[in-house]
C-alpha cells in the first residue's frame, strides 16, 4: 500500500490534495487510543456531551459553504446539493445532541417484596465506522452523532475517493471541544482496515454504509468477536405510479428521487413501475423534464447532474443501458456519454428507457446512475410483486390519490422506507434503514441512538 493517497476531482481530473495513509499498525494504535478515551468519555454527563455536539453543529453550519465546496470538488455533485448535504448532515448532530439527554432507564416491579430491579442504559463501547463516497459528509455525521451522544468513542474510515470531508468534519469537532481521541479518522487499504476493525476485541460495534456484498463480509468477520453491527446496504428502489396518480407530481418527485447526485444514492428510484394506461403520458413528461437537466462540473452555475464517481461505476451504467437496448428497450432521452479515460472523468447524460422488461439486468441490479427504466403493469398486485422481486428492501415510492389503495400498497411493500406521493422521505427525525438484504438497524429518529447503547439490569436484594 502506498504511503500517500491522492484525491482527484471527478469532474475535471485535477488533483485536490495528497494525504498520508495509515498502516494496520497505526489503525491498531488508533483503536487503543479510542479504547482508553472511552473510559473517560463514557463517564461525561449527558449535558456536557449535548453542549459539545451543539458547538460542533454550529461550526458546521457556520462553515457550510467551505464544506459544500469540498464535497463538490471530491465527489462531483452540484454545489447546491452539497450545501443541502451539509445542512442535512448537521441536522443529525443537532438532533442527537438533544437525544443524549433522553437515554432513560426504568424500574421494574420485582417478583418478590425483597428485591428491587433497576434497568440502565450504557454506551456500547468504541465504534468503528466505514462510510461511502456518495454522501461524504452526511453519512459520517449520521453515525458519529448518535455514537458520541450515547457516550461511545468513534473511528471513521471514509471512502478513498472522498476522504477530505471526514478530516474537515473532525477538525471542526476538535474546534468545538470534542477530544481528538474520542473522534478519529483513518484512511488506507479498505480490506486491511476492515479486517483490523472486525478482529479487534476493543471495537464493540461496526457501523457501515455501502454495498451488500461488503456488508456481508463485515458481518461475517465481526462474528468472531460478537460485535454489534449496523448495516445500511444496497437498494433497488421501485417507484410505482398508479392509474389515478397525479402525473405531474409523480414526474416531479421521480426527477428528485432519480437524478439527485447523478443517481448515485442507495435510495434513488431504480425501477419506474407505471400503470399501462398512463405510461405514454408519464414517459413523455418525464423525458421533457430530463432534457432540461444540465450535466457538468458541479461548481459551475446551473449544473444539475455531476460526474460519475469513477470508471467502474461508469462502465456498470453503460453496460446496463446496452443490455436493455439489446433486449428491446427504447432510449427516449439521453443514452449518451462523455468519457475521458486520461483524466478519469465520466459523465452520463440523464437517460429514460421504455419498453423495459424483467429480462434486463437493470431490473435486477442497482444502477447507481442517472438512468430511469420504465416498466408497465395492469394490476396493482402485479406492481407490488415487481417491486418486491428483489433481495433488497431499503426504499420504495408510490403515487396514488386513493387512500385505500395507498394503505394497501404501503402494507404490502417489503421496504423499510416508503414515500407515498413523496420522492424524498428521508428526514433526521425518522428512522432510516432497510429490510431484507438492505441492512440491519436504523439511523435517525428516536431509534437512532439505540444501536449505540447496551441494556443492563441490576437486581438488588433487600
Swiss-Prot record:
Expression triggers: Transcriptionally regulated by GabR in the presence of GABA. Up-regulated under low pH conditions and ethanol. Expression from the gabD promoter was induced by growth in the presence of glutamate.
Miscellaneous comment text of the record: Expressed from the major gabT promoter and from an additional gabD promoter.
One Pfam family, short name: Aldedh
Protein's UniProt name: Succinate-semialdehyde dehydrogenase [NADP(+)]
EC number: 1.2.1.79
Described purpose of this protein according to its UniProt entry: Catalyzes the NADP(+) dependent oxidation of succinate semialdehyde to succinate.
Domain of life: Bacteria
Alphabetized InterPro entries for the sequence: Ald_DH/histidinol_DH, Ald_DH_C, Ald_DH_CS_CYS, Ald_DH_N, Aldehyde_DH_dom, Aldehyde_DH_NAD(P), Aldehyde_DH_Superfamily, Succ_semiAld_DH
Active site annotation, chain numbering: 232 (proton acceptor), 266 (nucleophile)
Gene3D superfamilies reported in the protein's UniProt record: Aldehyde Dehydrogenase, Chain A, domain 1 (3.40.605.10), Aldehyde Dehydrogenase, Chain A, domain 2 (3.40.309.10)
Family in the record: Belongs to the aldehyde dehydrogenase family.
Gene name, Swiss-Prot/TrEMBL: gabD
Pathway given in the UniProt record: Amino-acid degradation; 4-aminobutanoate degradation
Any one Gene Ontology molecular-function term assigned to this protein's record: succinate-semialdehyde dehydrogenase (NAD+) activity
Keywords: NADP, Oxidoreductase
Mutant lacking the gene: phenotype: Cells lacking this gene are unable to use GABA as sole nitrogen source. No effect on vanillin degradation.
GO biological process terms, semicolon-separated: aldehyde metabolic process; gamma-aminobutyric acid catabolic process
Catalytic activity: succinate semialdehyde + NADP(+) + H2O = succinate + NADPH + 2 H(+)
Positions that bind NADP(+): 133-134, 157-160, 210-211, 233, 366
